[in-house]
Amino acid sequence: MLTHLDSQGRANMVDVTDKAVTSREAVAEALVRMLPATLQMIVSGGHPKGDVFAVARIAGIQAAKKTSDLIPLCHPLMLTSIKVHLAAEGDNAVRITASCKLSGQTGVEMEALTAASIAALTIYDMCKAVDRGMVIESVRLLEKLGGKSGHFIADDAQVAP
């Protein structure tokens, strides 16, 4: 059963009033593929708009905090930790990993996914003038801890211990 639908099939925000407050964490990722020259410009600090990784990191953090404003049925959450890590992968990609934590009554998967997605979109925005062929791919949940549904880890996920 989809939890965001009532008995008549109408969308509603899930009532979490009676759920226990537990520690919750989620990790998500996104990959941005680009021309090798674009990645070289980013990692060398030669982008005329500034530090692409720093701007994307801040954008991801802001996005996690704004998730309930962007996704209609998400609860507003008091996140206690948001981390966004960006790293060059090979000679033509940036891997973004975002993690969110809180003690609360609902999970933080959407916040982690939103952080990774917006960080990827920010890279695209900052670099589109030099590389319109960039591709954002593999936006996915890597790991989820806490809550009633327990621990989830993607089959091929490589998550830090």
Swiss-Prot record:
Enzyme Commission (EC) number: 4.6.1.17
Does Ribosomal protein show up as a keyword for this record? no
Q: Which SUPFAM superfamilies match?
A: Molybdenum cofactor biosynthesis protein C, MoaC
Q: Where are the transmembrane segments?
A: none
Residues reported in the UniProt entry to bind substrate: 73-75, 110-111
Q: Which NCBIfam families match?
A: moaC, PRK09364.1
Q: What is the species of this protein?
A: Pseudomonas syringae pv. tomato (strain ATCC BAA-871 / DC3000)
Q: Tell me, how does this one assemble?
A: Homohexamer; trimer of dimers.
**In the UniProt entry, which residues are flagged as the active site?**
125
What name does the UniProt record give this protein?
A: Cyclic pyranopterin monophosphate synthase
Q: Name one GO biological process term.
A: Mo-molybdopterin cofactor biosynthetic process
- InterPro entries named among the record's database cross-references: MoaC, MoaC_bact/euk, MoaC_sf, MoCo_biosynth_MoaA/MoaC, Mopterin_CF_biosynth-C_dom
Q: GO: which molecular function terms? A: cyclic pyranopterin monophosphate synthase activity
Say which family it is in: Belongs to the MoaC family.
Q: Which UniProt keywords apply?
A: Lyase, Molybdenum cofactor biosynthesis
Q: In which pathway does it act?
A: Cofactor biosynthesis; molybdopterin biosynthesis
Q: Which reaction does it catalyse?
A: (8S)-3',8-cyclo-7,8-dihydroguanosine 5'-triphosphate = cyclic pyranopterin phosphate + diphosphate
Q: Which Pfam families match?
A: MoaC
As for what it does, the entry says: Catalyzes the conversion of (8S)-3',8-cyclo-7,8-dihydroguanosine 5'-triphosphate to cyclic pyranopterin monophosphate (cPMP).
